[in-house]
Structure formats: C-alpha cells, structure tokens
A protein has these predicted regions:
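N-terminal leader/targeting segments and the immediately adjacent pre-domain N-terminus
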Residues: 1-8, 12-84, 100-108, 134-145, ...
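Short linear capping/connector segments at secondary-structure termini
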Residues: 24, 69-71, 112-120, 151-155, ...
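Catalytic loop of the DD-peptidase/beta-lactamase superfamily, centered on the K-T-G motif
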Residues: 24-68, 210-213, 218-223, 227, ...
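Short active-site loop at a secondary-structure junction
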Residues: 45-53, 73-135, 189-201, 265-268, ...
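Active-site helix/loop module of the DD-peptidase/beta-lactamase fold
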Residues: 85-88, 103-152, 184, 207, ...
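Structural scaffold positions in well-ordered secondary structure
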Residues: 136, 205, 277-280
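A generic structural signal for nonpolar/aromatic side chains embedded in well-ordered alpha-helices
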Residues: 136-137, 182, 294-295, 299
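The feature captures the short pre-catalytic strand/loop hairpin that immediately precedes
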Residues: 176-188, 249-261
Length: 377
C-alpha cells in the first residue's frame, strides 16, 4: 500500500521532474557507482534507517549498491538476493498486464467493470457513468483507498502498533468480505471525475484480469512478464511468507509482519529483488515494445500537473517525460523512476517505513539524478 500524502508527493515529483531533459548524461560506471555510494551513505545516516539498496540503469549499464544492515548489529547487509516487498509498485506490473490484455484485443479501457462481475452492483454507477477499466487504472473510480473501510486511515495514525493492527485486519478479511463491502460502497460523483488513490480498485482490476484471461494473476505475471524478462525472483505472494526481508516501522525495534495479501494481490502483492526490479525497469525503457508503449499512454489528466498512465504516475515538463511509482508497507518503502529521455532508471528500497522515509529517499534520487544528468548543457 502507499500512504504518501498528496501534497508531499506532488512536491517531491516536481523536484525530480525539473531535472529531466535534454542534457549530457554520465554513463561511465565508475562515476555512476561513486555517485550512488555517496548518496547511499548519506541516506544511511538518517535516523532509524538500517539499510538501503540502490539500483541505477543508465545507457544500458547497471550499477547496484547495498548499504547498512537489515537488522542492527547482525552484519547482514542486503545483497542482490535479498527479497523485498515492493507494495504498490506491484500496480505498475498489473498495469503492464492490462496493457498486454488490451493490446491483445481482449479488454477495452471503456468496458463497464460490472460486465465482469457476478452481481449487478447498481451502486457502481453515478448519473449514467459506470466505473470503467480506465478508472481502475487511474485511481479515478471513486472507490475507497481500501476495502474494508476499517483499513483506511490506519497508517496515518503513525502509532507504534500500526503494523500489528493492520496485520490483524488483513488476517480477518478475504474475497467474500470484499464482494460484500463492494456492494455497500456509495460513490459521490461520476467515475473519472477526481483522482483518489485506491488499492481496492487495483484489487478489482486484478480480479477482472483473471476473468478475462482465464488464469490466475500469478500465472499471468509468469507468462507475460517475469518469464520472458528473466525475473526469476519476482513472485506474487498470497498469504504470509517468511521469504521476505524483515522491515521496521518508525522507531520500532521489533520487525513488522509481512503483508498477508488475502485478496488477489493486485494492489501490493509482489516481492522481488533489486536485479529483477532493474530488469523490469529495462523493459520500461524499450520504446519499441508495443505493450510498454501502450502502458505509458496517459489515460487521465486533471488539466494540471497530474497525469496517470496504466498505473504509472507521469510527469512532464520542457525537459521530457518520466514515470514513477512509490510503494510502502509497515516495514519497507521503495521508489521506481523511469526517465526514457535519458535511458535512465533508478530504484531505491529500504527496510524502514515512516512518514519521512519517502521524502528522504527522493532526496537521494535528487542527488543521483543531479550528478548523472547535467541540465546546464
């Protein structure tokens, strides 16, 4: 799940977006490595931060660096085999599957989502406008952030017991309860009107993908994405798993439980490694791939700075276009940035989560991009 406040999110993205453009780009791996190491060490000095993994893909060359310890005093620095929860960055992979399904002619962005459901759900339409596939992709459906409603606001309390409260709620919830709750949702305006982040919407999208393609989301990921791209360590984890790295919430000394993922896993379910994330990033830099091209098409804009593609945040200025997504659990946070104009992608992952973590990570991205992309030329 992702709980970064909208104002903070917008400020961070505008800061990064202003750096992208027609410029001289550093591709020498030793220079890139030095930049990453300096930025990573600085991030590691932040309070409560135990570790960081950074990957940079630039000009077809990859630099990966790992910092700190996953558990204080144990000397266990993360490495290329460390498996992380990537939370809402999962949504970008779901977006890729949707683009693949649309490209195959099996799904349309204008399809009424009710046509894929087993009950009529008359509550999913306002003034004659139903929730459509495009609305689920762009968080404009009007659905709440989470179903059940009890999940909403838990993270924003920022209390020490957040990981355990949320985990308990997850364990008590399943698909049957999801459908019951979906029938009680009351939309306040026609879908497509307002952006409001919704993991519930992406879970519904995952269900629809399973119906249309007649296979599980797990199998679709394997066939369409992770298999062809050699992402052997990228999995959709449903229910608890002990295979992911331990993470920490705010000042807590005890680790947070991993996501339970009792639904379809389309909102937060993927776990992966840094090398696999960079393989996914390399795919996003392939302008010749028709599925990638489609998945980067803007589906919603508010007429201002917010543009949304297939689950990607899209940012534009006079220097070009970039794509990004944040993911956060009660124990990890990560950002994935794609800068096609500079053949550049950056992934950062830390096993700490708190209200300031995302901002600190983006300051680190800022330092890296500023060194690698010289906008003065």
């Amino acid at each position: 799940m992702s709980y970064l406040p909208l104002r903070t999110f917008t400020t961070i993205i505008l800061l990064i977006a202003g750096l992208t453009g027609h410029a001289q780009v550093t591709t020498d791996t030793s220079a890139v490595a030095e930049t990453v190491e300096r930025a990573g060490e600085k991030f590691l000095r932040s309070p409560n931060i135990r570790s960081l993994s950074v990957g940079v893909l630039i000009g077809g060359k990859t630099v990966r660096r790992h910092f700190g310890e996953l558990n204080t005093g144990q000397g266990n620095t993360p490495n290329d085999q460390t498996v992380y929860e990537i939370a809402s960055v999962t949504k970008t992979m779901v977006g890729y599957l949707v683009a693949s399904t649309v490209e195959a002619g099996k799904l349309s962005l204008d399809d009424d989502v009710r046509s894929f459901l087993t009950e009529p759900y008359p509550n999913l339409v306002v003034d004659g406008e139903p929730i459509r596939i495009r609305h689920l992709l762009t968080h404009t459906s009007g659905l709440p952030g989470f179903l059940p409603l009890a999940w909403n606001g838990v993270f924003e309390t920022f209390t020490p017991d957040v990981p355990y409260r949320f985990h308990e709620l997850e364990q008590q919830y399943g698909k049957e309860e999801f459908w019951q709750d979906l029938a009680t949702v009351q939309l306040t305006e026609p879908p497509g009107t307002t952006y409001a982040y919704s993991s519930a919407g992406t879970e519904l999208l995952a269900y629809i993908l399973e119906q249309v393609n007649e296979m599980s989301l797990t199998k679709q990921l394997e066939m369409v994405l992770t298999g062809p791209r050699g992402m052997a360590h990228t999995k959709l984890r449903l229910a608890e798993t002990s295979e992911v790295v331990t993470g920490y919430w705010m000042d807590n000394e005890d680790p947070s439980p991993a996501n339970f993922n009792s639904l379809w896993g389309g909102g937060v379910g993927v776990t992966t490694t840094l090398p696999d994330l960079l393989r996914f990033a390399a795919l996003q830099l392939r302008a010749d791939d028709p599925i990638v091209k489609r998945s980067h098409e803007v589906v919603y804009t508010n007429g201002g700075s917010r543009h949304i593609a297939y689950c990607w945040n899209v940012w534009r200025d006079k220097y070009g276009t970039s794509y990004n997504h944040h993911g956060g659990t009660s124990g990890t946070q990560n950002w994935l940035y794609i800068f096609p104009d500079h053949d550049l992608a950056i992934s950062l992952i830390t096993n700490h989560s708190g209200p300031k973590t995302a901002g600190k990570m983006n300051q680190t991205v800022h330092r890296i991009v500023r060194k690698l992309v010289d906008t003065r030329r």
